[in-house]
Amino acid sequence: MNSKYKVLKYKSNNTKNIDDLISIEEPLEITIKFKNKETWTENTISITMRTPGNDEDLVRGFLFNERIVEKIEYIDKIESVGENVGQYNLKNKIIATINNSENIDIDKIKRNFLTNSSCGVCGKTSLDSLEVIKKDKILKSLPKIPHEIIMKSPTILRENQSEFSKTGGIHASGLFSDKGDVVAIKEDVGRHNALDKLIGYALEKKLLNTSNQFLACSGRLNFELVQKALMSNIGVLIGVGAPTSLAIDLANKFDMTLVGFVKQDSFNIYSNKERIIIKN
């Protein structure tokens, strides 16, 4: 499932406005319904960010792979519930009714997904908790980043990844000055963990100066990375991969500049192009 977004594309000293297809990212709340002694009870066990479609298969596989059910036959039914919500008019909650609840330990299940390291959003147990706490928009005046600095930053990020050079299986987040100087770089197997490490380090060392800094991340740009960057008033977030629909929507809502598909001679600006200085 995808949607068209307006994008300013830079390539080889030329810019043009294009329509770009963006993968849709939406939260899915997974609730299980089971018999606790003689009483039917419902518990939300996880939220996962997903591309809508095949949601029943996703939930079925999730319940089996995590051994919440030992057999698929233990799932009586899976149904989408609630109102259609959001920009894409989707149901974002599913209830799975389980007919064999002997081995269900709801407290253990919740603990497991609250500490899930692969997705920081997945552990939250209410769609409401995804709402961004931040109230104020980012000032549009700063920072101003030359386009050549944008294109160089992924290479600099990679060159400073000590663990990636050894394993090839790790993400990085980097804080750069508007001159292209490295302020700090941190690595982790999870994109959101790498960004948390970076922000934590920058705060501890008092390195944050958002009026002349930007963030660069390996991989794609999703809702959670934008949300984390917003908490520190980061005005420009760039990535070597594609952004999701929710990432673009959130960046637009708070006046963040989001730049994706950054290569040595090209990039796409998805929101608030004014912060990127393009010299033809």
Located regions from the model:
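Intrinsically disordered, low-complexity regions enriched in acidic/Ser/Thr/Pro/Gln residues
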Residues: 1-178, 182-185
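Surface-exposed beta-strand edges and their flanking turn/coil or helix-capping segments
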Residues: 58-63, 73, 109-111, 136-137, ...
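A signal for specific C-terminal beta-sheet/loop modules enriched in small/flexible residues
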Residues: 62, 117, 123, 196-201, ...
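Short beta-strand-to-turn element immediately C-terminal to the catalytic PLP-Schiff-base lysine
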Residues: 176-177, 270-272
